[in-house]
């Protein structure tokens, strides 16, 4: 399962 939104820092 993959998150729909990935936070990029």
UniProtKB/Swiss-Prot annotation:
Keywords carried by this UniProt record: Amidation, Neuropeptide, Secreted
Primary localization class, coarse: secreted
GO cellular component: extracellular region
Subcellular location(s) per record: Secreted
GO biological process: neuropeptide signaling pathway
Family: Belongs to the FARP (FMRFamide related peptide) family.
Protein name: FMRFamide-like neuropeptide FLP3
């Amino acid at each position: 399962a993959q998150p729909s939104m990935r936070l990029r820092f």
